[in-house]
A protein has these predicted regions:
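Core beta-strand elements of the Rossmann-like FAD/NAD(P) dinucleotide-binding domain
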Residues: 1-6
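Short, flexible helix-adjacent loops and helix caps
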Residues: 22, 86-88, 169, 173
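Glycine-centered loop/turn positions within well-structured domains
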Residues: 15, 72, 162
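A generic secondary-structure signal marking the coil-to-beta-strand transition
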Residues: 35-37, 60, 70-72, 134-135
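Conserved FAD/dinucleotide-binding core of flavoprotein oxidoreductases
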Residues: 46-127
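Conserved mid-domain beta->alpha element of the FAD-binding
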Residues: 8-9, 39, 119-179
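Central beta-strand plus flanking loop segment that forms part of the substrate or channel wall
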Residues: 14-57, 80
């Protein structure tokens, strides 16, 4: 890629480009302690909705939104302490879904949760102090992570690309550094 005018790296939260050039991008990576898992449901959700449960082991939040007609995303989040007390580490995906269906039965209104690689994770907060190196510009979650519940790292990368394009047009065809 040495002969390229510009390389846009938008390879996500686990960016290989950011890792390869970490001495230049100077990322700050902080592993957050809350646990979360993504699931789906046929439960209709009109708007982005938060459901909070004050469970016997601590608060649990369900971040929910429609992603297509008749289908909604359910992102469940809780503290590590709450997760451990519920013993989610002992459940497989279906076991976790079953337990969450029990906890959020009222909110699910009789609908089941749908699993698809619905593993429990902890999310890193990433922020790069430098957003470019030579002719490489880093974008989206590779550059700075947003909260996982919004599920729009690709949208953020596109917005970064639009802003960079606007800066290049404004500055004239110059280096990434000047833009």
């Amino acid at each position: 890629f040495a002969d390229s005018d510009m390389i846009l790296a938008s390879d996500g939260i686990s960016s290989a480009i950011r890792e390869h050039y970490k001495e230049y991008f100077n990322p700050s990576v902080v592993q957050k302690t809350n646990r979360f898992t993504w699931m789906g449901s046929t439960r209709k959700v009109e708007d982005f909705t938060y459901f909070f449960k004050d469970s016997k082991y601590g608060p649990i939040c369900a971040h929910t939104y429609q992603y297509e007609e008749g289908m909604s995303t359910w992102v469940f989040e809780m503290s590590d302490e709450c997760w451990q007390k519920w013993q989610f580490e002992e459940f497989n995906e279906q076991g976790s879904a079953d337990k969450l269906e029990e906890i959020f039965a009222e909110e699910l209104e009789g609908h089941n949760l749908i699993i698809n690689r619905s593993m429990w994770r902890q999310f890193p907060r990433i922020y790069c102090n430098n957003w470019h190196y030579k002719n490489i510009a880093i974008l989206g979650d590779a550059k700075a992570s947003a909260h996982f519940s919004i599920g729009s790292g690709s949208k953020l990368a596109m917005e970064c690309a639009i802003s960079l394009s606007d800066a290049i047009v404004e500055q004239g065809e110059v280096s990434v550094d000047k833009a």
